[in-house]
């Protein structure tokens, strides 16, 4: 039962999303599938082949973001993850202005939210447990000129591995910026996860993960931003909260080619 729990959790989340949508709580939603091939990864094997499913939606109570990354290690394997791994985050945010029918905007802040996230790493190796992290804190929607969106969340991290103490703080900005180019556009989007302090055996870390993609849609008769291709850069200092040393390198500089289809 424990082995099936992560998949049951994800299935329940997706089914619940569409059930609520039928009740007209949903304002809009977007789903996408991305395929990536990259090199330069640390801690895990150097080469990653990745399929990513993403869901973003806006509701009468707030918003929701979900992604599922499935990795293959090009024939190699890790001690804990085997030949592949799955990592997912489910991040609902609850809008205080929507829930209280109060305008909380000020300056560049459009809305104030209660931000939460449930992070799960699924191990493909006997004898290793799946790992969970729970995050909660204040979130903000920002109105910054030129950006399609810009969010800023502050999280208190609560690990659920039985060994790591709570007490680490994480700052997470997410953004998207579109620039017209060659009768189409270039999309610059991404996020930063910055765990600002150490706790127990866990180091601080800094994860910068932007994508630059060219929108192919207008050239194929598709709606804007349906199909895009480009490059993802992945800089991760002290990856997995493991401090980089001369004997075990955890500072990562990886680059991947990406093709993304949105539906």
Briefly describe each language-model feature range.
Residues 22-71:
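Short glycine/proline- and aromatic-enriched beta-strand/turn motifs that initiate or cap beta-hairpins
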Residues 35-41, 70-74, 116-124, 154-160, ...:
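Transmembrane beta-strands of outer-membrane beta-barrel pores
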Residues 53, 90, 136-138, 173-175, ...:
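Membrane-embedded beta-strands of outer-membrane beta-barrel proteins
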Residues 67-127, 205:
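Surface-exposed loop and membrane-interface regions of Gram-negative outer-membrane beta-barrel proteins
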Residues 155-226, 236-237, 261-263:
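Outer-membrane beta-barrel transmembrane domain signature
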């Amino acid at each position: 039962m424990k082995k099936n729990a992560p998949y049951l959790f994800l299935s329940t989340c997706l089914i619940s999303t569409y059930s609520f949508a039928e009740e007209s709580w949903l304002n809009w939603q977007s789903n996408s599938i991305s395929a990536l091939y990259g090199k330069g990864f640390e801690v895990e094997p150097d080469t990653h082949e990745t399929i990513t499913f993403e869901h973003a939606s806006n509701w009468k109570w707030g918003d929701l973001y979900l992604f599922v990354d499935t990795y293959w290690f090009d024939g190699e394997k890790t001690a804990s993850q085997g030949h592949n791994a799955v990592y997912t985050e489910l991040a609902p945010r609850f809008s205080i202005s929507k829930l209280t029918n109060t305008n909380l905007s000020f300056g560049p802040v459009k809305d104030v939210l209660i931000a939460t996230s449930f992070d799960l790493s699924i191990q493909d190796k006997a004898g290793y447990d799946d790992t969970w992290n729970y995050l909660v804190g204040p979130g903000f929607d920002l109105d910054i000129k030129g950006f399609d969106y810009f969010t800023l969340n502050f999280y208190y991290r609560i690990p659920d591995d039985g060994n790591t103490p709570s007490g680490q703080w994480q700052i997470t900005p997410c953004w998207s910026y579109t620039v017209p180019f060659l009768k189409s556009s270039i999309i610059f989007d991404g996020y930063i996860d910055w765990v600002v302090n150490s706790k127990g055996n866990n180091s601080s870390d800094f994860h910068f993960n932007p994508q630059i993609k060219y929108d192919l849609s207008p050239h194929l008769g598709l709606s804007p931003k349906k199909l895009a291709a480009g490059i993802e850069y992945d800089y991760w200092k002290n990856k997995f909260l493991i401090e980089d040393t001369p004997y075990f390198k955890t500072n990562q500089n990886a680059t991947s080619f990406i093709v993304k289809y949105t539906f």
